[in-house]
Amino acid sequence: MNYTQFREAAYRHLVSCKQLLNDAKDSTTKKDAKDRLCLEIYYLSGYILESMLSYAVCSSMNVNGDVNQSKPFKEDRTRFKVHNLNQKYNYALQNGCNGLRNICFFQKKHQDNLVQNLFDDWRVEYRYENRSNLSPEILSKYISSIEGIYQTILKKYTR
């Protein structure tokens, strides 16, 4: 796997979230379907951030070739290959990703507390849970912020 595949995965997840969001906003979508779509959007959103943080780390460490043979995967596996976004962010900062210091959600909190809470609460297990606080409106703000992070990382770490 080449490190650019992290960027490609993030892009695919972002496109999927936007399409699912359009479907969830559709007035003809039934409530049960809307709830499932919102949960799927929320679940995928974390993988956009996770993939882009991995991309930034690999880019800043000049990883070339197979990522599985690189330092983050071989030597720091338990700190790099995690689903905890704050742990991954801290690992990125410790490994030269200083351009991430002021991105939304981590050190610079989002101005909308509901949007910030979505980020703070994200974890893989939510795929299997019911979240009553998810709505297309709040997820639209959340995905828009994540897209901003995606663009920022893309600009700072594409070599």
Positions of the model-derived regions?
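Terminal alpha-helical segments
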Residues: 1-159
